[in-house]
């Protein structure tokens, strides 16, 4: 409490210092940003945006222009002060800054001190914005950026399933709802630009960031990503999809360092890896793009004129600004090692088309080499004006020069994490769950069960069962808690059984290591609990220690002692249900052969326990469909949809086929398709056709069905995929 009071006192005192010289800039219907007493064109809300951009550029110095081309990381990471201070007039951002990332969102040095109650966070951003508007010469507002791939990356914001789970819903309308919730909460808290969605396609399940992807198919990822972009920007925010481009297929799935060396041919790059971004820009009008760390064919993407100008701007008509992933610019000099000096590094990225550099280091580390590169003639003033103009255009489009203080500093709690938003979170958790196996209709379980054993390292886990770039400190309901609350009259007991990983992981994946005394005791406890129970529900999978950025794997089997736990509990002879809570595909061949019922829940978010309980006991009929292929062996990888002829052919000495295919998912009911109609039997290159059919629920339960349409060419000028999805529709 003392820290918060001190911070607020500092805020007020700073505000009083500034107020005397700036109180007259706020006019009726306009703001005198440059404090000259005249309504300049860039200050006129009625003037065309291009005219406002040109007028502002004409008034800017070299120092002011270059300051727009860098990010200032907030929350004590680079910006060490919680509130503006008099010392800021000596910092490089005295001439402005392009954007401030993750300020007062609950991460970093200040934690929840500034982020919650929510009004503190809004007031903090308003005071920082006020400093830039009132204390810099031209008063150019800051773009406050934040992450948001599974809900807004803010303390106690509404949490949704990880993007891999959102992909499993196959529900475009739901993604639009998630986008609106994220946007509404961002707006209420004063953020203006959300770094979402991730449009990387997950073609290699070993890769650590598959958890953050909508799936392996470019059509599905593009359609869902388009809805996220449209939903965010419909509420007045900028959406910045990432990571452009060809980022998600590093050789061997190895994630770390620069994520270099994607072995992707040009045609595959365009049809698979660029297609979701093309949709996001051409069809949804994304105002931002984040450039990636990796190279393509030896050229770093963040320094590539081909990617950032020829493809983005010339081919696709991109009108926003490109921000680098953190340290992607510096990698040209330090890791890719293609620019001998920092000045050449700055010149290459700016000439290529990059607008804003981001890194966890002070902005002057880029701005000063940038200025030297300009003075040395490595960057023309024309190019500089292009890059800065693109940044300013987005700021005008966001309305920052008309209202630089968005957000509700009085009652943001009426918006953030409200009841309606929690309903959308619950809906998303339910729709993301995929039923993988249901032998003899073992599921749904009877609600009259007396003794239920909930076993496994993910049964009572909270902290590690999310992924990055989303809400923190949300009240997550565990699977054990969810089942216990769902059946208050049953005896529901819990045993951990083992940890997600053992102490020798990942080396233990290379050879058998005997169980130590503690590990054996944990498994024994779980076995004894199963023996005295009517059923054992095992909750296994992964967590942030096994799947996330920089956490790639060389195996897709269950980690640690989980397989031994599963087999030991199964050996008791009691009925077993397996619930997988994980962020990637797993080679659960043994479970698929022996365990009668398997459910995959991904990382469902704050209503994890409630949603899984509803599915297991029949209050909700699971309708999720896999957005990634489950291989039988890691040796089959890469093994992802869409396939080319021959890539899934049979062999004599290798494992063939998939464990679960892309688009797969069972239901508690059955559906019948009939009366397929095609409007035209033959169409030309630029013509359309309409297909329709009748889908009938032939079972005894209500349920959802994802109608999937796949097409292929009989003959084509080049080798193409056997079939590709072209439409999807969720019906209930």
PLM features: residue spans?
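Glycoside hydrolase catalytic-domain context in secreted enzymes
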Residues: 16-723, 727
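Bacterial Sec-dependent N-terminal signal peptides
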Residues: 1-20
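Cationic, low-complexity basic patches in intrinsically disordered or flexible, solvent-exposed regions
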Residues: 730
């Amino acid at each position: 409490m003392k820290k918060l009071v001190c911070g607020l006192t500092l805020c007020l005192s700073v505000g009083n210092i500034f107020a005397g010289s700036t109180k007259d800039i706020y006019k009726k219907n306009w703001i005198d940003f440059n404090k000259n007493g005249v309504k300049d064109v860039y200050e006129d809300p009625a003037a065309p945006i291009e005219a406002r951009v040109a007028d502002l550029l004409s008034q800017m110095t070299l120092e002011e222009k270059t300051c727009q081309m860098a990010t200032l990381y907030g929350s004590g990471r680079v910006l060490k002060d919680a509130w503006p201070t008099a010392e800021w007039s000596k910092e490089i951002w005295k001439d402005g800054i392009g954007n401030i990332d993750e300020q007062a969102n609950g991460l970093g040095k200040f934690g929840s001190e500034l982020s919650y109650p929510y009004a503190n966070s809004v007031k903090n951003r308003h005071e920082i914005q006020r400093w830039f508007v009132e204390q810099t010469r031209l008063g150019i507002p800051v773009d406050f950026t934040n992450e948001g791939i599974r809900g807004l990356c803010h303390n106690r914001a509404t949490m949704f399933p990880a993007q891999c789970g959102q992909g499993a819903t196959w529900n475009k309308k739901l993604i639009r709802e998630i986008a609106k919730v994220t946007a509404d909460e961002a707006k209420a808290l004063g953020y203006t630009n959300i770094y979402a969605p991730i449009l990387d396609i997950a073609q290699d399940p070993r890769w650590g960031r598959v958890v953050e992807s909508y799936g392996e198919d470019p059509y599905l990822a593009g359609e869902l990503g388009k809805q996220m972009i449209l939903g965010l920007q419909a509420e007045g925010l900028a959406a910045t999809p990432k990571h452009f481009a060809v980022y998600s297929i590093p050789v061997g799935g190895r994630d770390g360092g620069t994520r270099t060396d994607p072995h992707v041919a040009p045609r595959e790059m365009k049809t698979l890896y660029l297609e979701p971004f093309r949709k996001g820009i051409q069809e949804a009008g994304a105002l931002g793009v984040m450039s990636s760390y990796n190279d393509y064919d030896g050229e770093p993407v963040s320094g590539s004129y081909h990617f950032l100008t020829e493809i983005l701007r010339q081919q696709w008509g991109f009108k926003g600004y490109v921000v680098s992933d953190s340290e992607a610019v510096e990698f040209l000099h330090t890791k890719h090692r293609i620019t001998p000096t920092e000045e050449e590094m700055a010149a290459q990225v700016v000439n290529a088309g990059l607008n804003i550099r981001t890194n966890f280091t002070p902005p002057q580390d880029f701005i000063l080499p940038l200025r030297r590169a300009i003075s040395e003639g490595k960057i023309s003033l024309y190019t500089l004006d292009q890059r800065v103009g693109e940044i300013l255009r987005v700021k005008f489009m966001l309305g920052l020069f008309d209202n630089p203080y968005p957000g509700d500093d009085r009652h943001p709690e009426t918006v953030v994490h409200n009841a309606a938003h929690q309903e959308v979170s619950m809906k998303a958790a339910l729709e993301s769950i995929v039923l993988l196996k249901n032998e003899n209709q073992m599921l749904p379980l009877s609600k009259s069960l007396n003794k239920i054993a909930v076993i496994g390292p993910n049964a009572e886990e909270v902290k590690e069962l999310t992924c990055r770039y989303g809400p923190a400190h949300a009240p997550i309901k565990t699977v054990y808690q969810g089942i216990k609350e769902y059946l208050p009259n049953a005896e529901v007991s819990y045993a951990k059984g083992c940890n997600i990983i053992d102490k020798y992981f990942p080396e233990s994946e290379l050879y058998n290591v005997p169980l130590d005394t503690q590990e054996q005791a944990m498994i024994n406890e779980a076995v004894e609990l199963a023996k005295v129970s009517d059923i054992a529900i095992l909750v296994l999978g992964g967590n942030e220690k096994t799947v996330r950025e920089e956490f790639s794997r060389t195996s897709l089997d269950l980690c640690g002692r989980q397989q031994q736990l599963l087999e030991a509990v199964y050996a008791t002879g009691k009925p077993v249900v397996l619930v997988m809570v994980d962020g990637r595909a797993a080679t659960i061949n043994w479970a698929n052969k022996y365990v009668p019922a398997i459910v995959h829940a991904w990382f469902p978010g704050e209503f994890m326990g409630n949603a899984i309980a509803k599915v297991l006991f029949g209050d909700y009929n699971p309708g999720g469909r896999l957005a990634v292929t489950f291989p039988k062996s890691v040796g089959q990888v890469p093994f992802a949809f869409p396939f080319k002829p021959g890539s899934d052919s049979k062999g004599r000495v290798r494992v063939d086929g998939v464990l679960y295919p892309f688009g797969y998912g069972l239901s508690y009911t059955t559906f019948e398709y009939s009366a397929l109609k095609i409007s035209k039997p033959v169409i030309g290159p630029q013509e359309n056709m309409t297909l329709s059919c009748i889908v009938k629920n032939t079972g005894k339960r209500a349920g959802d069905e994802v109608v999937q349409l796949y097409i292929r060419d009989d003959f084509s000028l080049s080798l193409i995929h056997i079939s590709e999805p072209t439409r999807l529709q969720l019906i209930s």
